[in-house]
């Protein structure tokens, strides 16, 4: 296990108490004694996960997992955390299972070559893992902790996203320059759409009607209208008849250069393309597919996260040591928050009062207050941290 050096620990131990000085009470809610909340940070360079105690804003521990952890997700129904380990280039990957109640590694699930992402359904029963090195999607039974199916995708699938109704899996195939759609009930390929160079991510609207995929090797977003079953009125006057609709390509939207990721507002009304080579964001109306605004945002924007009230977008800039704050209604930058070097992932605390920023180059996690939109403290992580997920729960 690779732990921070004594010098690093000393530096952070000085920063932490200073950060708490003058802290306003509304930044830290009063929790019951059995409340727990942790942030799990994957460290790709040290084969570990750093566990952060969110309630007390401190490092809880560091766990050894598999080789090259690259993604993490939490169960919506159990106190478990799932870490994707991409493994050696010529070997198989795995998914480590962490028991969140005692923060220990409880098991591992073998998958295929170079897994890079994980998506969990709303029941917490199934997970979908994109295996970029074997061009497959592993379907995992999380209760049994085993793979139950493998679906063939396009070349180098890097993101698998599940629609909110759990019926459609949208897969971005980066090297295949395509998007695959799977029916989750039958686990069969339903459609494939070509012409998205470097497909790298996907977001799906809350009503499961449409998916958007950034084409990171170009300057476009692919908008796909998802299939809809026929809806018939159950009784006179209850509803209008809605005809069935197949999956179809709706539009290719021009944005900035190399859009790596999309940030969707919680209400689904707008999304933001992070244009990494244009140092900008593009604001897209998800109903009309219109580009509402384009704004210079920072050095190599790679991740965005929208506040729960749909008002503020936070953007992690890999090539600068700050997070840009963007007011959505006003369509402009309103500030920046200091972070570490190489910011690459973002997550809110469950209260929304704290923002955690993963800094890949400096090997730390910056913590910011969202009420004042200001830097709060810096916590150490392992080498090359790259992803984060938070889990909150109450002990019995």
Model regions and ranges:
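Sec-dependent bacterial lipoprotein signal peptides
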Residues: 1-21
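Predominantly soluble domains enriched in secretory-pathway, periplasmic, or organellar proteins
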Residues: 23-396
């Amino acid at each position: 296990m690779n732990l921070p050096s004594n010098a690093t620990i000393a530096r952070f131990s000085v920063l932490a108490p200073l950060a708490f000085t003058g802290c306003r009470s509304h930044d830290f809610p009063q929790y019951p004694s059995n409340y727990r909340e942790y942030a799990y940070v994957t460290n790709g360079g040290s084969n570990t996960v750093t566990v952060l105690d969110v309630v007390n804003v401190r490092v809880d521990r560091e766990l050894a997992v598999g080789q090259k952890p690259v993604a993490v997700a939490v169960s919506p129904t159990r106190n478990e955390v799932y870490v994707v380990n991409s493994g050696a280039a010529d070997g198989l990957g795995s998914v480590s299972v962490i028991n969140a109640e005692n923060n220990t590694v409880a098991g591992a699930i073998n998958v295929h070559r170079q897994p890079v992402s994980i998506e969990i359904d709303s029941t917490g029963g199934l997970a979908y893992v994109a295996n970029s090195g074997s061009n497959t999607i592993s379907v995992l039974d999380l209760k049994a902790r085993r793979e139950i199916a493998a679906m063939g995708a396009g070349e180098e699938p890097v993101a698998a996203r599940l629609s909110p109704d759990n019926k459609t899996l949208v897969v971005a195939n980066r090297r295949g320059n395509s998007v695959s759609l799977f029916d989750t009930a039958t686990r069969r390929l339903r459609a494939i759409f070509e012409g998205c160079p470097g497909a790298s991510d996907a977001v799906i609207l809350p009503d499961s009607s449409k998916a958007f995929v950034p084409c990171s090797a170009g300057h476009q977003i692919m908008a796909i209208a998802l299939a809809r079953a026929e809806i018939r009125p159950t009784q006179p006057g209850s509803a209008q008849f809605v005809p069935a609709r197949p999956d179809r390509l709706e539009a290719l939207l021009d944005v900035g250069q190399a859009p790596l990721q999309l940030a969707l507002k919680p209400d689904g009304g707008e999304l933001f393309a992070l244009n990494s080579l244009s140092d900008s964001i593009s604001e897209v109306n998800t109903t009309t597919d219109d580009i509402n605004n384009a704004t210079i945002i920072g050095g190599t924007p790679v991740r965005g996260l929208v506040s729960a009230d749909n008002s503020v977008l936070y953007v992690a800039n890999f090539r600068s040591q700050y997070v840009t704050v963007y007011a959505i209604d006003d369509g402009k930058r309103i500030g920046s928050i200091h972070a570490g070097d190489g910011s690459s992932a973002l997550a809110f605390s469950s209260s929304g009062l704290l923002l955690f920023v993963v800094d890949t180059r400096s090997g730390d996690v910056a913590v910011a207050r969202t009420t004042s939109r200001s830097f709060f403290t810096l916590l150490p992580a392992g080498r090359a941290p790259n992803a984060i997920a938070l889990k909150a729960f109450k002990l019995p």
